[in-house]
Amino acid sequence: MISPQGVAVATLLILGVVHGSLIDDLKAKFSSSSSGFGASMFSNSGAKSSFGGGFAMPKLDASKAAMVHSSSSHKGHHQSSGSSSNTHSLTVVGADGKNITENSEKKDGYNKESKVDEANENTKIKSADGSVIETGKSHNKSSDDASSYGLEKSSKTYADKNGTMLSSNTNKINNQSRSAALDEGNEFVNQQNADGTFLRNNTGHKNTDEHLSHNVLDENAQMSIGADGTSHNITNRKGSVGDSHNAASDAHSNFESLDAQGNKKSQNYSKKAASASGSNADFESNLESLKNADGTSMSNSTGNFNNTSYDKATAEEVMSKKNVNADGTSSMEASHAGSNSSKINSASGQSSDLSMVGPNGIKSHSTSNKTDNYALDEANQSAGSISEQIGKNGQRSLNESSIESGRKAESRNNTAADTLDSVDANGTVSSSHSKSASGTSLDENHNKTHALQASVDEHGNMKNHSIDGSYRNKKTGEFGNSEMSASIKNADGTMSQVNVKNDTNRNTYEAEKSALEKNHEKNSDGTFKDESKGSNSRVNRTDGGSNLAVGSYSVGKGGVSSNETIASSNAFNTSDAESNQFDHLHQKTANGTEITHAKDSKQVAASANAKSSLDTSMSAVDAKGNKVDKTSSQAADSHDAISASSDVDAKIVKHADRSESISNDSSNQTASEHNDSSKQSEHEKRQNADGSFSDVSSNSAKKNAVKDATDVRQNAFANVDAAGNSVSEVKNSLVENHSNDSDASSDSKIHSKSVDGTELTDAKHSNVSTSHLTEGQLAQIQKKLAMADGSVVMSNDNSHITHEKSRADVDAGHKAHLSKADGSSTDIDEGFKHHSDLESRGEGAQKQRYQKLGNGTESSMDVGYEKSMAKGGDQTSSHKKTLAKDGKGHFTETKDGSESHHKIDDKDVKQHKDIIQM
């Protein structure tokens, strides 16, 4: 290996030899010459001196040199600019009264500037033992700046003695600029020693940057005025303004070495980044107006715009290290990190406005406006690392870790508005206005993690442990609403108007989550352990609704009018969720025991809700003065829900002596419910000009409720010992519940009077209610004992309970009264009632036994009972009454009635017992 001191000594020796040779050569060549030299001898003209060709310079072979050094550099600065300008002017004053004026101006120019700074340097040194050192470095820095501008203006006017005038104007701007820069550099060292060892190092970077901008505008206007008072104007304007910035950077470093002992090292590193940002705005507007001699006119305006801005960035960093040693050991390490982000905002729109005035009072005006807005904000990150070590005796270790995360938010919104108003020659006024808005949104988040640790020791024992997790959620939304109104008003006072309003919305939410942990161990003695446990869950939710409102109103001739409204609404929400948990183990211990154990749980749930309503109304008056009013209303809602869960716990244990035990426990639960209700009402009222009227109304309501639930469980156990004796036990149970309730009611009323004096009053009502409940339970226990000598003992116990209950109620009635102008009348009164209820219970149990002894003796027993009970009854009653009068003091009356009763009371008990002995 070449030392720095050796390099310095070698360099001095080389310079000393060259310097001594030059002195000897000069002494030999100029010993007899005068010491006076002309000034032209050292001039820069490049011409040969009077001494001829001078020294004969020797040519050296660089491949055989002990040292070679070369360098170069370049620096430059360039700048330029330019501009131009043109003007024009014209004025004419004519004898005939015509005047003309023209003016124009045009300017443009540019500026450019560039700079450069470059340098390279390389050195190579050889030692006598064959060692070589190479070094080098370079850099390059440059910049470019350029800009340009342009301006153009012109104007023209014309006028004559009749009053006619014309004019036009233009204005244009065009400005551009660019700025860019570069900075890069590299440096290296390469050392190769005679003994085969080496060292290499290389570093570098590169940075770029660029800016762009522009400003463009184009305007023109034209105007004309006629001698008759007419005019016509046109204006146009459009332009664009924007800038952008782009930048990037890149840096790296690489290192590698080998020492005399054979140890090798390497290291690599890089870092990159980039960004882009900017904004841009485009716009355009147009205006035209026209005025005629007859007083008619027109004005039209339109425009649009589009604005955008953005900001984006990326970054990355990577590192790796590796060591390989001569003794076989090694280590490795690497890491990575990266990110990206993006932001975008944009807005655009269009607009128009048109007005017109026609003959005979005709007018119209219309407008339209639309907008569109968008936004995005997104970012993601990730990072990870890994490392590994290898030891002398087969030991190894590994470590990993990583994480990822990100988010995203996005939205879009739109609006629109339109109007139209007009007046026709008859004086009719029409109007139509509408507006709407809608939008969507998105919001997301996620992350993910991972970790791993693994190792092997010198005895071959292995361990592996990992943890993983993830999460994600997502939200979405959307909405829309609109309004519209239209009307017509006539000169005779008649009119009509309509209004409509509507809105909707919907939102969703989703989420997921999971976690997992694993542990694995395997040892050289045959023992092991495998364990995994974790959980996962998800949830989904949705909600939304809509509303609608409509109204109309009109007025006709002769007092005729009408008014109607409709309103409806709907709303809903749903949800469902699920989750799971587990823990699994498989293990073998040093004493030969093997264990298998699994636990699993699961839960699910879902629900849904809904509501709706509808309301209407109507009122009207006809030409005769008859009036009518109607209203109706409806409403309904519902609810549904279900849920379920399950659990399992299973375990098996095996021992080295062949004894074994097994257990298995499980349970399942379910539940559901449903509820719904509804209401409805109607009312109609009529009032006639002749004094007759009618009033009719009705109402109804309903309710329902249903519930169900179950619970199922089982416990099982078994064991066998080393001698062959076994015992087992199983337990089962079941519980069920069911209920159903309902209610319904209704009523109606009528009140009317006719022209001849007849009057009617009528009322009805009805109520119905029911209820039903069912419950049940089952239980069972089974046991068995078996001995190695053949003895067996068995038992079986069963029991059950049932319960049922029901109820019903009914109530209905009807009353009516009819009277006439002659004094006669009729009355009706009817009614009905019913009530019933019934309840029943039952229970039972059974015990069974069996025994067989080793000497052959057998015996059995069977004992049980059953109980049942029923209790309840019903009662019903009704009546009817009528009364008729003739208005002269005579009447007829009828009465009917009925009533019934029933009662139930039952009980039963049954028992049995059987014993058998052999």
From Swiss-Prot:
Region described as Disordered: 66-150, 226-283, 326-481, 515-548, 594-707, 737-774, 800-918
Residue ranges, compositional bias (Low complexity): 79-89, 270-281, 430-441, 632-647
Compositionally biased region (Polar residues): 326-354, 363-372, 379-404, 534-545, 604-619, 661-672, 689-702
Domain of life: Eukaryota
Protein name stated in the entry: Uncharacterized protein F59B2.12
Signal peptide: none
Segments of skewed composition (Basic and acidic residues): 103-127, 515-533, 648-660, 673-688, 738-765, 800-814, 830-846, 883-918
Organism the protein comes from: Caenorhabditis elegans
